[in-house]
Amino acid sequence: MDNEYLLNFFKKKNVPIIQKKRHTYLTYYGLEQQDTYVLKEGVIKTSIILHDGREFNISYINTPDIISLLKDEVSQYTSAPFNVRVESDVATFYRIPRVLFWSYVNQDQKLQDYVNAYYREKLSEAIFRQQCMMMNGKTGAICSFLYQLIHLFGRKVEAGMLIDFQITNNDIAGFCGITTRNSVSRILCEL
């Protein structure tokens, strides 16, 4: 996907930019919102709250990406598809009314192609994450998640690869469908 096209498109249209600080929420799952958000810079975590009250983490996003697009395109207001929490010191977003966003998409073929590619990519990512969690057990889910973190935050060091991002065992548990951080600690010690 051509993130530069998306960012330049919003810049040309003078779409307002907002900033959020670490551990503040941009959206809450299920609450009404009228805007579409596009991450410009920073790191965010998307998650939902399960029926038993636990948080199920969906993904970290650290590149320009459309954040809140997974609902219908005609309603002025729609419920947020998930929680979005800022994980970097600051994150910057473009904020555009949903109806105006979809108007732009319908008028611009390249933006339409971007949105179609966005949906295909998000579906592929969701299938891959589910496959990793379902087919590999808890240890495999953690290993797979750590491998995904290398692609997002990894940098080469003398001893190998360093995941240059602070993440708690509780967050790892939330990404891997594990109930407690103690289970994550035990599995990490066994690796």
Go through the PLM ranges and name each one.
Residues 1-26, 66, 71-75:
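Cyclic nucleotide-binding regulatory module and flanking cytosolic helices
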Residues 21, 40-41, 62, 88:
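A cytosolic small-molecule/anion-sensing beta-strand core signal
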